[in-house]
């Protein structure tokens, strides 16, 4: 299964549209968004996504109840929470925005997860720590680093591919 991974979209509509187009072209079945959508209006863009969404709230996401409601309106299978533990293709995932550093570190060290995915720092990370894949897709918006990125994880091969949005 292919999983699209993104974070820190920060209202950047052109890059959100590019990411959705890539995810649709790649036939991803699920998109993980690690938070910081920021404004509610960006959720409407995800109506064009041909996959369900697993998302976390970021520290810049305000209207949490409405955010959850709007995501559910797009697809009843969409979920959003502060921390998510989910199994996909026999892999155990922990997903968070990443602004609670101690929680992130505990998840990585716990031995409970195969994959830990987070955002918040806007810095790209792909590493293996004690048999745990640790992924930060960087920032979709490109505001801090100047390099807008998303990623695709192939769960069968356990391979991650970074994509720079141009």
UniProtKB/Swiss-Prot annotation:
Chain residues that bind Ni(2+) 1: 8, 10, 36, 122
Cross-referenced InterPro entries: Calcineurin-like_PHP_lpxH, Metallo-depent_PP-like, MetalloPDE_YfcE-like, MPP_YfcE, PdiEstase_YfcE_CS, Phosphodiesterase_MJ0936/Vps29
pH influence on activity: Optimum pH is 9.4-9.8.
Regulation (activators, inhibitors): Competitively inhibited by phosphate.
MF annotations from Gene Ontology: hydrolase activity; metal ion binding
Broad class of enzyme this protein falls into: hydrolase
Cofactor names: Ni(2+); Mn(2+)
SUPFAM superfamilies from the UniProt entry: Metallo-dependent phosphatases
Residues binding Ni(2+) 2, per UniProt: 36, 59, 97, 120
Function: Shows phosphodiesterase activity. Hydrolyzes phosphodiesters bonds in the artificial chromogenic substrates bis-p-nitrophenyl phosphate (bis-pNPP), and less efficiently thymidine 5'-monophosphate p-nitrophenyl ester (pNP-TMP) and p-nitrophenylphosphorylcholine (pNPPC). No catalytic activity was found toward cAMP or cGMP, nucleotides or phospholipase substrates such as phosphatidylcholine. The physiological substrate is unknown.
Similarity annotation: Belongs to the metallophosphoesterase superfamily. YfcE family.
Subunit (UniProt): Monomer.
Record's protein name: Phosphodiesterase MJ0936
Species this chain originates from: Methanocaldococcus jannaschii (strain ATCC 43067 / DSM 2661 / JAL-1 / JCM 10045 / NBRC 100440) (Methanococcus jannaschii)
């Amino acid at each position: 299964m292919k999983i699209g991974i993104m974070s820190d979209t920060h209202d950047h509509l052109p890059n959100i549209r590019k990411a959705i187009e890539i995810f649709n072209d790649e036939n991803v079945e699920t998109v993980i968004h690690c938070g910081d959508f920021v404004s509610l209006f960006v959720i409407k863009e995800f109506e064009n996504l041909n996959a369900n969404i697993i998302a976390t709230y970021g520290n810049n996401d305000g209207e949490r109840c409405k955010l959850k409601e709007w995501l559910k309106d797009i697809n009843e299978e969409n979920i959003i929470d502060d921390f998510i533990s989910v199994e996909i293709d026999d892999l155990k995932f922990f997903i968070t925005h990443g602004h609670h550093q101690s929680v992130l570190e505990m998840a990585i060290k716990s031995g409970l997860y195969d994959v830990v995915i987070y955002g918040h720092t806007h810095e790209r990370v792909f590493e293996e720590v004690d048999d745990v894949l640790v992924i930060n897709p960087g920032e979709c918006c490109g505001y801090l680093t100047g390099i807008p990125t998303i990623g695709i994880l192939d769960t069968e091969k356990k391979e991650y591919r970074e994509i720079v949005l141009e």
